[in-house]
Protein backbone atom coordinates (compact mmCIF):
# COMPACT_ATOMS: atom_id res chain seq x y z
CA UNK A 1 0.00 0.00 0.00
CA UNK A 2 1.03 3.61 -0.60
CA UNK A 3 0.45 5.61 2.58
CA UNK A 4 0.79 9.35 3.21
CA UNK A 5 1.06 10.43 6.86
CA UNK A 6 1.39 13.89 8.37
CA UNK A 7 3.15 14.54 11.66
CA UNK A 8 5.64 11.67 11.31
CA UNK A 9 8.48 13.14 13.36
CA UNK A 10 7.20 11.92 16.73
CA UNK A 11 4.40 10.20 18.60
CA UNK A 12 1.63 8.37 16.79
CA UNK A 13 2.67 9.49 13.31
CA UNK A 14 6.20 8.18 13.69
CA UNK A 15 4.97 4.92 15.19
CA UNK A 16 2.58 4.41 12.28
CA UNK A 17 5.27 5.20 9.70
CA UNK A 18 7.73 2.77 11.30
CA UNK A 19 5.13 -0.02 11.45
CA UNK A 20 4.01 0.41 7.86
CA UNK A 21 7.57 0.47 6.54
CA UNK A 22 8.50 -2.61 8.60
CA UNK A 23 5.52 -4.42 7.11
CA UNK A 24 6.29 -3.74 3.47
CA UNK A 25 4.26 -0.61 2.71
CA UNK A 26 5.56 2.58 1.08
CA UNK A 27 5.32 5.72 3.21
CA UNK A 28 5.52 9.41 2.35
CA UNK A 29 5.47 11.58 5.44
CA UNK A 30 5.92 15.12 6.63
CA UNK A 31 6.62 16.91 9.88
CA UNK A 32 7.98 20.20 11.16
CA UNK A 33 11.21 18.97 12.77
CA UNK A 34 14.08 19.18 10.30
CA UNK A 35 16.45 16.95 12.31
CA UNK A 36 13.78 14.27 12.76
CA UNK A 37 13.00 14.33 9.04
CA UNK A 38 16.72 13.96 8.27
CA UNK A 39 16.85 10.94 10.59
CA UNK A 40 13.84 9.35 8.89
CA UNK A 41 15.37 9.90 5.45
CA UNK A 42 18.62 8.28 6.56
CA UNK A 43 16.89 5.35 8.24
CA UNK A 44 14.27 4.78 5.55
CA UNK A 45 15.57 5.70 2.07
CA UNK A 46 13.62 5.44 -1.18
CA UNK A 47 11.00 4.40 -2.08
CA UNK A 48 9.95 6.13 1.16
CA UNK A 49 10.11 9.91 1.36
CA UNK A 50 10.03 12.43 4.18
CA UNK A 51 9.84 16.21 3.99
CA UNK A 52 9.90 19.10 6.46
CA UNK A 53 6.47 20.67 5.98
CA UNK A 54 4.18 22.69 8.23
CA UNK A 55 0.66 21.58 7.29
CA UNK A 56 -0.67 24.98 8.34
CA UNK A 57 1.02 26.53 5.28
CA UNK A 58 -1.07 25.70 2.18
CA UNK A 59 1.60 26.59 -0.39
CA UNK A 60 4.16 24.34 1.33
CA UNK A 61 1.62 21.51 1.51
CA UNK A 62 0.78 21.92 -2.18
CA UNK A 63 4.43 21.73 -3.21
CA UNK A 64 4.98 18.68 -1.02
CA UNK A 65 1.93 16.96 -2.52
CA UNK A 66 3.17 17.66 -6.05
CA UNK A 67 6.45 15.91 -5.26
CA UNK A 68 4.76 12.93 -3.60
CA UNK A 69 2.11 12.49 -6.28
CA UNK A 70 4.75 12.78 -8.97
CA UNK A 71 6.85 9.97 -7.54
CA UNK A 72 4.35 7.81 -5.67
CA UNK A 73 1.04 8.49 -7.36
CA UNK A 74 -2.24 8.83 -5.49
CA UNK A 75 -2.03 7.28 -2.02
CA UNK A 76 -4.18 4.35 -0.97
CA UNK A 77 -4.41 5.81 2.54
CA UNK A 78 -4.09 9.46 3.54
CA UNK A 79 -3.64 9.79 7.31
CA UNK A 80 -4.00 13.29 8.76
CA UNK A 81 -2.21 12.88 12.06
CA UNK A 82 -0.39 16.20 12.63
CA UNK A 83 -1.82 18.05 15.60
CA UNK A 84 -1.22 20.46 18.47
CA UNK A 85 -2.78 20.87 21.89
CA UNK A 86 -2.96 24.05 23.95
CA UNK A 87 -1.19 24.41 27.28
CA UNK A 88 -3.82 23.47 29.91
CA UNK A 89 -5.71 26.60 30.97
CA UNK A 90 -9.27 27.90 31.28
CA UNK A 91 -10.48 29.13 27.90
CA UNK A 92 -10.41 32.79 28.92
CA UNK A 93 -6.71 32.47 29.77
CA UNK A 94 -5.65 30.88 26.48
CA UNK A 95 -3.85 33.56 24.39
CA UNK A 96 -5.41 34.29 21.02
CA UNK A 97 -2.23 33.39 19.13
CA UNK A 98 -2.02 30.01 20.87
CA UNK A 99 -5.65 29.24 20.05
CA UNK A 100 -4.96 30.29 16.47
CA UNK A 101 -1.99 27.93 16.15
CA UNK A 102 -4.07 24.99 17.34
CA UNK A 103 -6.80 25.80 14.81
CA UNK A 104 -4.25 26.36 12.02
CA UNK A 105 -2.73 22.90 12.40
CA UNK A 106 -5.66 20.82 13.64
CA UNK A 107 -8.35 22.11 11.26
CA UNK A 108 -6.84 24.20 8.47
CA UNK A 109 -3.86 21.85 8.20
CA UNK A 110 -6.16 18.89 7.63
CA UNK A 111 -8.07 20.83 4.98
CA UNK A 112 -4.80 21.85 3.30
CA UNK A 113 -3.67 18.24 3.02
CA UNK A 114 -7.06 17.07 1.77
CA UNK A 115 -7.09 19.83 -0.86
CA UNK A 116 -3.65 18.77 -2.06
CA UNK A 117 -4.03 14.98 -2.18
CA UNK A 118 -7.68 14.01 -2.47
CA UNK A 119 -8.25 15.18 -6.08
CA UNK A 120 -5.78 12.53 -7.28
CA UNK A 121 -7.53 9.91 -5.17
CA UNK A 122 -10.93 10.95 -6.54
CA UNK A 123 -9.60 10.82 -10.10
CA UNK A 124 -8.41 7.26 -9.52
CA UNK A 125 -11.71 6.40 -7.81
CA UNK A 126 -10.35 4.79 -4.66
CA UNK A 127 -8.66 5.59 -1.39
CA UNK A 128 -9.30 6.14 2.29
CA UNK A 129 -8.83 9.41 4.18
CA UNK A 130 -8.30 8.93 7.91
CA UNK A 131 -8.45 12.10 10.01
CA UNK A 132 -7.26 11.61 13.56
CA UNK A 133 -9.86 12.87 15.98
CA UNK A 134 -9.78 12.28 19.73
CA UNK A 135 -11.86 11.16 22.66
CA UNK A 136 -12.06 14.92 23.22
CA UNK A 137 -13.64 15.22 19.79
CA UNK A 138 -16.62 13.27 21.13
CA UNK A 139 -16.59 14.50 24.73
CA UNK A 140 -15.01 17.45 26.55
CA UNK A 141 -12.61 18.21 29.38
CA UNK A 142 -11.64 21.37 31.24
CA UNK A 143 -8.59 23.40 30.25
CA UNK A 144 -8.34 21.99 26.72
CA UNK A 145 -11.24 23.86 25.10
CA UNK A 146 -9.28 24.88 21.97
CA UNK A 147 -8.17 21.31 21.37
CA UNK A 148 -11.68 19.96 22.01
CA UNK A 149 -13.12 22.50 19.59
CA UNK A 150 -10.74 21.47 16.82
CA UNK A 151 -11.35 17.77 17.27
CA UNK A 152 -15.13 18.22 17.30
CA UNK A 153 -14.58 20.16 14.07
CA UNK A 154 -12.62 17.25 12.59
CA UNK A 155 -15.52 14.91 13.30
CA UNK A 156 -17.88 17.21 11.40
CA UNK A 157 -15.45 18.01 8.61
CA UNK A 158 -14.76 14.33 7.99
CA UNK A 159 -18.41 13.32 7.98
CA UNK A 160 -19.21 16.12 5.53
CA UNK A 161 -16.29 15.05 3.33
CA UNK A 162 -17.67 11.51 3.40
CA UNK A 163 -20.88 12.80 1.81
CA UNK A 164 -18.87 14.36 -1.02
CA UNK A 165 -16.66 11.44 -2.00
CA UNK A 166 -17.53 9.16 -4.90
CA UNK A 167 -18.65 5.61 -4.27
CA UNK A 168 -15.77 3.34 -3.39
CA UNK A 169 -13.88 5.88 -1.28
CA UNK A 170 -14.06 6.65 2.43
CA UNK A 171 -13.37 9.41 4.94
CA UNK A 172 -13.17 8.25 8.54
CA UNK A 173 -12.66 10.24 11.76
CA UNK A 174 -10.52 8.04 14.02
CA UNK A 175 -10.20 8.30 17.79
CA UNK A 176 -6.74 6.83 18.46
CA UNK A 177 -7.35 6.47 22.19
CA UNK A 178 -5.19 7.61 25.09
CA UNK A 179 -1.50 7.03 24.37
CA UNK A 180 1.70 8.10 26.11
CA UNK A 181 2.99 10.80 23.75
CA UNK A 182 4.60 14.22 24.13
CA UNK A 183 1.18 15.75 23.56
CA UNK A 184 -0.45 13.74 26.35
CA UNK A 185 2.38 14.67 28.71
CA UNK A 186 1.49 18.33 28.17
CA UNK A 187 -1.83 17.56 29.86
CA UNK A 188 -1.12 14.63 32.18
CA UNK A 189 2.55 15.28 32.98
CA UNK A 190 4.15 12.14 34.45
CA UNK A 191 0.72 10.51 34.64
CA UNK A 192 0.94 9.90 30.89
CA UNK A 193 3.47 7.14 31.57
CA UNK A 194 0.67 4.86 32.80
CA UNK A 195 -0.78 4.70 29.27
CA UNK A 196 0.47 2.53 26.37
CA UNK A 197 3.44 3.70 24.32
CA UNK A 198 2.98 4.79 20.72
CA UNK A 199 4.84 1.76 19.36
CA UNK A 200 2.54 -0.61 21.27
CA UNK A 201 -0.49 1.30 19.99
CA UNK A 202 0.72 1.14 16.39
CA UNK A 203 0.83 -2.66 16.45
CA UNK A 204 -2.96 -2.60 16.68
CA UNK A 205 -3.79 0.76 15.11
CA UNK A 206 -1.80 0.40 11.89
CA UNK A 207 -3.50 -2.80 10.70
CA UNK A 208 -6.84 -1.47 11.97
CA UNK A 209 -6.47 1.53 9.65
CA UNK A 210 -5.65 -0.75 6.72
CA UNK A 211 -8.92 -2.55 7.41
CA UNK A 212 -10.93 0.63 6.88
CA UNK A 213 -12.66 0.93 3.53
CA UNK A 214 -15.73 2.14 1.69
CA UNK A 215 -17.97 0.32 4.17
CA UNK A 216 -16.71 2.69 6.88
CA UNK A 217 -17.30 5.95 5.01
CA UNK A 218 -18.42 8.61 7.50
CA UNK A 219 -18.29 6.28 10.50
CA UNK A 220 -16.71 7.54 13.72
CA UNK A 221 -14.14 4.84 14.43
CA UNK A 222 -11.96 4.07 17.44
CA UNK A 223 -8.89 1.88 17.82
CA UNK A 224 -10.10 -1.08 19.86
CA UNK A 225 -8.57 -1.38 23.31
CA UNK A 226 -7.28 2.20 23.54
CA UNK A 227 -10.49 4.16 24.09
CA UNK A 228 -9.72 4.92 27.79
What kind of region is each of these model predictions?
Residues 9-10:
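Conserved glycine-rich cofactor-binding loop
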Residues 23-38:
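Conserved glycine-rich Rossmann-like NAD(P)H-binding loop of the short-chain dehydrogenase/reductase
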Residues 89-91, 98-100:
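Substrate-binding pocket helix/loop in short-chain dehydrogenase/reductase
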Residues 114, 150:
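Active-site helix of classical SDR
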Residues 119, 163-164:
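Alpha-helical segment proximal to the catalytic Tyr-Lys
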Residues 134:
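Residue(s) in the substrate-gating loop at a strand-loop-helix junction
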Residues 167-169, 173-176, 181, 190-228:
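C-terminal helical subdomain
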Amino acid sequence: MKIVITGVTRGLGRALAEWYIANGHTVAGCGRSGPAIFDLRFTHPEPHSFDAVDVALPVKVSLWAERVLGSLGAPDYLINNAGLINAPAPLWKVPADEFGKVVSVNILGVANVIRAFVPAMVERGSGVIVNLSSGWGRSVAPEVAPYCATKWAIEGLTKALAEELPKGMAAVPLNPGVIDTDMLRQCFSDGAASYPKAQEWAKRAAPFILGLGAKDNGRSASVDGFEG
